[in-house]
């Protein structure tokens, strides 16, 4: 399988970044095209930064397409002019695009130069990234106040970006709900599974590029399934389980998350665990694959035919009580009385 490279800025965009940092540009729009960061648009300053803001920013916010905007302020620090970083992810854009732009956000800041960025905003509607929205953001930073939905999402994205500094103590706050984007080959494999063109998919996380990539789609039956599970690395597996239940032939998609315990680093274990739920959401919602059973294992040897069948069709442990004679009334009972019939006592009366 040919592994795709991560998303980075083109040479033309890098050159434009260098030119813009000198102060001749007010606004830069960056978009993702053909797995690369490219220049989408730019504008020169007309007036002060606050006068230029809305007329420069708002027309560039597409209702369907995420993007990044870098907006130059008039203030300077030791490295030169200060900039705002605006991440636009409209509600109407496809989920896969949102995930791709969220995962690439840190790369854009790194390519531009994080030391030049004074502040950043995240927006899902235009009001979030308007000049008034920026003023509200500054006010919320200055005083403790409830965060807007956009600010909460930005806060979660910032938390996710810290995932490279993982410790046992920080795992719950840094790794909730990570969404690594599926590489195109992995997406195609899921579509093929939906069409039953393949019956097995194995995926892994690329921790450097922050993506979910396809390992292989080798044809696999139940007997071969245990041998597909690596003993020294975590994996996600999707298996089309063909079997018979109560006389009916069935085909059930089973998701298997294999994690060989402490043979994997803490970082790897936590990233796989955190990305799992968002991956399954995408598989069920975007690819319309119904997952019959979700299984977690530590060793491939667990995947026997009996184990799979019992997981997909759990046994109903109904308690059946044997028939017993009804008990008599509770409490103490008197002595038995012997009632003799006529003539039984020897009398002829």
From Swiss-Prot:
Q: Which GO terms describe its biological process?
A: actin filament depolymerization; barbed-end actin filament capping; cell projection organization; cellular response to growth factor stimulus; cellular response to retinoic acid; negative regulation of actin filament polymerization; positive regulation of axon extension; positive regulation of lamellipodium assembly
Query: A Pfam family for this UniProt protein?
Result: Cofilin_ADF
Record's keyword annotation contains Repeat:
yes
Q: Where in the cell is it found?
A: Cytoplasm, Cytoskeleton; Cytoplasm, Perinuclear region; Cell projection, Stereocilium
List the residue ranges forming a coiled coil, or say none: none
* Family matches, as SUPFAM superfamilies: Actin depolymerizing proteins (SSF55753)
Q: Where is this region: Disordered?
A: 322-349
- GO CC terms: actin filament; cytoplasm; extracellular exosome; filopodium; growth cone; lamellipodium; myofibril; perinuclear region of cytoplasm
Q: Supply the SMART domains for this chain.
A: ADF
Query: PROSITE patterns recorded for this chain?
Result: ADF_H (PS51263)
Q: How does it assemble?
A: Interacts with G-actin; ADP-actin form and capping protein (CP). May also be able to interact with TWF1 and phosphoinositides, PI(4,5)P2. When bound to PI(4,5)P2, it is down-regulated. Interacts with MYO7A.
Return the PANTHER family for the record: TWINFILIN, TWINFILIN-2
What family does this belong to?
Belongs to the actin-binding proteins ADF family. Twinfilin subfamily.
Function of the molecule: Actin-binding protein involved in motile and morphological processes. Inhibits actin polymerization, likely by sequestering G-actin. By capping the barbed ends of filaments, it also regulates motility. Seems to play an important role in clathrin-mediated endocytosis and distribution of endocytic organelles. May play a role in regulating the mature length of the middle and short rows of stereocilia.
| UniProt protein name | Twinfilin-2
Q: Per the UniProt entry, what species is this protein from, by scientific name?
A: Homo sapiens (Human)
